[in-house]
Amino acid sequence: MLTVHLEDLVFHAHHGVYSGESAVGNSFQVSLSVSYEEEKIKLNDLKNVINYEDLFNIVKKRMAVPMPLLEEVAESIIRKIRHEYANIKKISITILKLNAPIEGIHGKVGITLSKKFD
């Protein structure tokens, strides 16, 4: 199994349930792992592998669509990646909100969603 990683990507986006979050936006950190079986393909040609630039562009486009919950954002990214690459066996995505509007919090909050496919 081969896994492609995109780690600690940072986006400004307008996700959140509070009006200030959707209006002003926030910084988000995204990490993504995509695993697939590589044993039947040649790994010396970009058309035979999952291109991390394509994955980045999918994440970037989905992060630009405002949604109230990070769970919904993660699910939409996973659905799009799976639609583009049917041979994927596992996807895991972590989305962290870097400046959560919670009084007194100093740190990141977020979610991780992982899905396995047959």
Residue ranges, per PLM feature:
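N-terminal, polar/charged subdomain of small-to-medium soluble alpha/beta proteins
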Residues: 1-118
